[in-house]
Amino acid sequence: MLAEGYEIRPLAVGDGPALAMAYRCNREHLAPWDPTRPEAFYTAEAQSVEVADRLRVVAAGQGGSWVLVRDGEVAGRVNLNNVIRGVLQSASVGYWVGADHTGRGLATAMVEHALTEAATLGLHRVEAGTLLANEPSQRVLVKAGFERIGIASEFLFIAGKWQDHVLFQRVLHHRPLESTRAGRR
């Protein structure tokens, strides 16, 4: 259930400026969990380019992107990334919630929304990773039905260094893979 006044909607062409503002406002809040970003990342122009790139991925059926909005401002974001078809039928999920919006179940709602969309795309599983110390994000994943599957050493370059991550997965269904789907995608 989404907290009152919030909406999760698909990323849209005009979202670049609002995303840039959200990233600027949450720069310190997100810094421990994000890659080191160049200054240009925080501009409306850079975010508009990123939005256009993501929308191409979405249009190709290779991912999904949604924003959490309150009062017309971006309060968070969730993406389905790295869609792999064939015999894997998998994707990864990434998400963040702005500092002023934490503790309301919003991250869990966004992840659950992405899982519903992943099922619509016909995916079998979704994976996620968190830094070892990011216990709030680990709780989000467990609440959304993910299971912990292990530790990946030096998994991602976050906050200026290679960092270990706890890996999670959520299996969406146990149906057999349609051979025509595996061959086409």
Give names to the regions the model predicted.
Residues 1-92, 98-100, 162-163, 167-185:
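GNAT-family acyltransferases
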Residues 37, 132-133, 155:
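Conserved beta-strand edge residues that scaffold enzyme active sites
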Residues 72, 105, 122, 134, ...:
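Conserved G/P- and acidic residue-centered "switch" motifs that form tight phosphate/ATP-binding loops
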Residues 95-97, 103-116, 120, 135-143:
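Conserved acetyl-CoA-binding loop-helix of GNAT-fold acetyltransferases
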Residues 141, 146, 168:
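Conserved active-site tyrosine of GNAT-family acetyltransferases
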